[in-house]
């Protein structure tokens, strides 16, 4: 595969990593740990928290969590690069989806290597009912997975027709 075929991957993943790290850096500089800044009252705050675990704090208190997350994320990054190669150049949705997931994985990997945990700052809630805080990398992963499912479904329908 030629380098030109990796343009989408490099562009989107780099953009996700850059925006993720920039926003996390701003939050760390502008807010104190656990400080919240209401943006939309009773619905959305910017908050500075750190997550030692995976999604929803899973494995946060595991002894070897940092090496575990660094190794599993590194393996995922290699797998995603391989998976990207499986898409034909005309399968743009799938390529964009994998690129988003890869960028998000790298963004959170950078935090794990630097801090041993991930900086989260987006807090969506309904009054006192909070969804766990997340970040740009998490958002890219979720959107990318959704797009990946859509791409797989769409490709499945095309093969049946």
UniProtKB/Swiss-Prot annotation:
Top-rank lineage group of the source organism: Bacteria
Q: How does it sit in the membrane?
A: Multi-pass membrane protein
Q: Which Pfam families match?
A: Peptidase_A8
Q: Which GO terms describe its biological process?
A: proteolysis
Q: Name one GO cellular component term.
A: plasma membrane
Q: Which UniProt keywords apply?
A: Aspartyl protease, Cell inner membrane, Cell membrane, Hydrolase, Membrane, Protease, Transmembrane, Transmembrane helix
Pathway involvement?
A: Protein modification; lipoprotein biosynthesis (signal peptide cleavage)
Compartments it resides in: Cell inner membrane
Which InterPro entries does the record cross-reference, listed alphabetically?
Answer: Peptidase_A8 (IPR001872)
So what EC number does this one have? Answer: 3.4.23.36
Which positions carry the signal peptide feature in this UniProt record?
none
What molecular functions are annotated in GO for this chain?
A: aspartic-type endopeptidase activity
Where is the catalytic site? 120, 138
Q: For this protein, what reaction is catalysed? A: Release of signal peptides from bacterial membrane prolipoproteins. Hydrolyzes -Xaa-Yaa-Zaa-|-(S,diacylglyceryl)Cys-, in which Xaa is hydrophobic (preferably Leu), and Yaa (Ala or Ser) and Zaa (Gly or Ala) have small, neutral side chains
Q: Where are the transmembrane segments?
A: 64-84, 92-114, 131-151
Spell out the PANTHER family in the cross-references.
LIPOPROTEIN SIGNAL PEPTIDASE
The entry assigns this protein to a family as follows: Belongs to the peptidase A8 family.
The job of this chain, per UniProt, is described as:
This protein specifically catalyzes the removal of signal peptides from prolipoproteins.
The protein's name is Lipoprotein signal peptidase
What organism does this protein naturally occur in? Answer: Syntrophotalea carbinolica (strain DSM 2380 / NBRC 103641 / GraBd1)
